Amino acid sequence: MTMASKSDSTHDESGDEAADSTEPESALETARRQLYHAASYLDIDQNIVERLKYPKKVHEVTIPIERDDGTVEVFTGYRAQHDSVRGPYKGGLRYHPDVTRDECVGLGMWMTWKCAVMDLPFGGAKGGVAVNPKELSPEEKERLTRRFTQEIRDVIGPNQDIPAPDMGTDPQTMAWLMDAYSMQEGETTPGVVTGKPPVVGGSEGREEAPGRSVAIITQLVCEYYDQPLDETTVAVQGYGSVGANAARLLDKWGATIVAISDVNGAMYEPDGIDTASVPSHDEEPEAVTTYADTVISNEELLTLDVDVLIPAALGNVITKENAEAIAADLVVEGANGPTTSTADSILADRDVAVIPDILANAGGVTVSYFEWLQDINRRAWSLERVNDELEAEMQAAWRAVKDEYENRDVTWRDAAYIVALSRIAEAHEARGLWP
């Protein structure tokens, strides 16, 4: 697979953030740098860029809950609403001890770009609670969720801000949130959140969607580079919802999956893995290596000589320390932010194509959009329809990004951000600034 040479750098030219600092960028620094960089390719009003540097609103709340032992503990929660020029805010809610205001702002900006590159009628938001969910009993987690919902009830809603699951939350969390909101509204309002169980208004195919979109984009980019899928080797870091679903679909479509991994290490089989026979993290946590004849480290997986590398676990796993050793021709980002900015530049210099997360794993927010449509219309879709509609949306987004990639001679990441920012800027131009 031969990659075309493109832009040799994805660094921000504004100088506001040190893209090659020894310290990892914060989510907010990264989002702003990507904004400046995309804007440098476009003839847009710099006043719009200035507005997009900041969230429209950030809500900070205190959440007192009674623990199972009768004591009361107070947690801090956030909901950062970045931009709603194209529609209601949309983004996840995470429960993690490291949740901060700035993290929510930065991730909310990323959601703005992701929704725009997919041409969804949403803006970006992100929220969460600074708590370790592993230290909560199910009853405590429910009380936390319901109280958090009450604290942010006035700033969320089907036409205002629609949360979804994220790190430390799941469909059950969303069901509690929907119920707490509905009880206060006096009517069942399933469209207030997405990622719910189907029995209470969730969509078929929602949990599998990010992995499915990664597989679809991998197939499309292989076609673009004249790489037959049945002659393509793939390594997948992470075997959770994203990695497992992507690996199994690509396996089904004819690719050879030579490595998969979890936190304990990687299973390596040069002749190909029967992905259906290896349980995902959801099916049997941290079990990948117990099914392996040959075990390698996660670090070794990243540098395997394969056609396609799919980092689908953690952020910042491809760094300046290992970017020169990446042997894959193509990197498809299944995780959020798996490639640091410095590594991105190194890979671009080496003509390694990197398909960015805001395109590749956008299946999650896209099927969340489908779920929202089903909720407000009170009509459920079949799994077949969900998957067909997702494929159509991914192909449309791919075509838009591909056109910018070819016309502007930029990297795939730059092309995706150019598509997103041009759509957002056009909406701001049309709506204007009031008063």
Curated annotation (Swiss-Prot):
<dbReference type="GO" id="GO:0006538">
    <property type="term" value="P:glutamate catabolic process"/>
</dbReference>
<feature type="active site">
    <location>
        <position position="126"/>
    </location>
</feature>
<protein>
    <recommendedName>
        <fullName>NAD-specific glutamate dehydrogenase A</fullName>
        <ecNumber>1.4.1.2</ecNumber>
    </recommendedName>
</protein>
<feature type="compositionally biased region" description="Acidic residues">
    <location>
        <begin position="14"/>
        <end position="23"/>
    </location>
</feature>
<dbReference type="Pfam" id="PF02812">
    <property type="entry name" value="ELFV_dehydrog_N"/>
</dbReference>
<dbReference type="InterPro" id="IPR036291">
    <property type="entry name" value="NAD(P)-bd_dom_sf"/>
</dbReference>
<dbReference type="Pfam" id="PF00208">
    <property type="entry name" value="ELFV_dehydrog"/>
</dbReference>
<dbReference type="InterPro" id="IPR006097">
    <property type="entry name" value="Glu/Leu/Phe/Val/Trp_DH_dimer"/>
</dbReference>
<dbReference type="GO" id="GO:0004352">
    <property type="term" value="F:glutamate dehydrogenase (NAD+) activity"/>
</dbReference>
<dbReference type="InterPro" id="IPR033524">
    <property type="entry name" value="Glu/Leu/Phe/Val_DH_AS"/>
</dbReference>
<dbReference type="InterPro" id="IPR046346">
    <property type="entry name" value="Aminoacid_DH-like_N_sf"/>
</dbReference>
<comment type="similarity">
    <text>Belongs to the Glu/Leu/Phe/Val dehydrogenases family.</text>
</comment>
<dbReference type="InterPro" id="IPR006096">
    <property type="entry name" value="Glu/Leu/Phe/Val/Trp_DH_C"/>
</dbReference>
<keyword id="KW-0560">Oxidoreductase</keyword>
<dbReference type="InterPro" id="IPR054867">
    <property type="entry name" value="GluDhGdhB"/>
</dbReference>
<comment type="subunit">
    <text>Homohexamer.</text>
</comment>
<dbReference type="InterPro" id="IPR014362">
    <property type="entry name" value="Glu_DH"/>
</dbReference>
<dbReference type="InterPro" id="IPR033922">
    <property type="entry name" value="NAD_bind_Glu_DH"/>
</dbReference>
<keyword id="KW-0520">NAD</keyword>
<dbReference type="InterPro" id="IPR006095">
    <property type="entry name" value="Glu/Leu/Phe/Val/Trp_DH"/>
</dbReference>
<feature type="region of interest" description="Disordered">
    <location>
        <begin position="1"/>
        <end position="28"/>
    </location>
</feature>
